[in-house]
Amino acid sequence: MKLSTKVTELTNIIAPAVAACDVALWGIEFAPQGNRSLLRIYIEALPEEQAQNKQVTIENCAAVNHQVSGILEVHDPIAGEFILEVSSPGFDRAFFSDEQMHAYVGQTVSLRLIQAIGEGDKKRRKATGTLNSIDGTSLKLTATDGEQFEIALSNIDKANLIYEDA
């Protein structure tokens, strides 16, 4: 889940504007698309508000959109036109850093890997299962078929939480 140089640059510019709106920055997706790019910002309630079961509102998203639009006009880090979207990460949230996954140990995640794992004809570049543990270099996953994996964090291209209705 290595962030691109452009996403890192945008994060450094955008993070203070998001914080000024009293919400937390969950992550940023940037997709250049010819002469029009897409910038998607995910925000979530601050930890102390989450403890009170407060969620991101449409008003939070509108405030962040307004603040970030102004900052981007000043810094102009995106060539050409762009579409700005602001939303919560949702139930099936993407993880943008290894640290974000710690709070979801015991839950189901979906991983897209850089290099295949497994043996023989069971090799796979995608794995879905229960996140058993995570440390500084790897995570342990019990796949939905019961197979156990230890996966290097550096081998994860993309990770998402799988929402399961309780």
Swiss-Prot record:
HAMAP family: RimP. Belongs to the RimP family. The keyword Transferase does not apply. It comes from Psychrobacter arcticus (strain DSM 17307 / VKM B-2377 / 273-4). This is Ribosome maturation factor RimP. One of its GO terms (biological process) is ribosomal small subunit assembly. Required for maturation of 30S ribosomal subunits. Its main location: cytoplasm. NCBIfam families: PRK14631.1 (NF011224). PANTHER family: RIBOSOME MATURATION FACTOR RIMP. GO terms for cellular component: cytosol. The keyword Phosphoprotein does not apply. It comes from the Bacteria. It is found in: Cytoplasm. Disulfide bonds: none annotated. Pfam families: DUF150_C, RimP_N. Gene3D superfamilies: Ribosome maturation factor RimP, C-terminal domain (2.30.30.180), RimP-like superfamily, N-terminal (3.30.300.70). Keywords: Cytoplasm, Ribosome biogenesis.
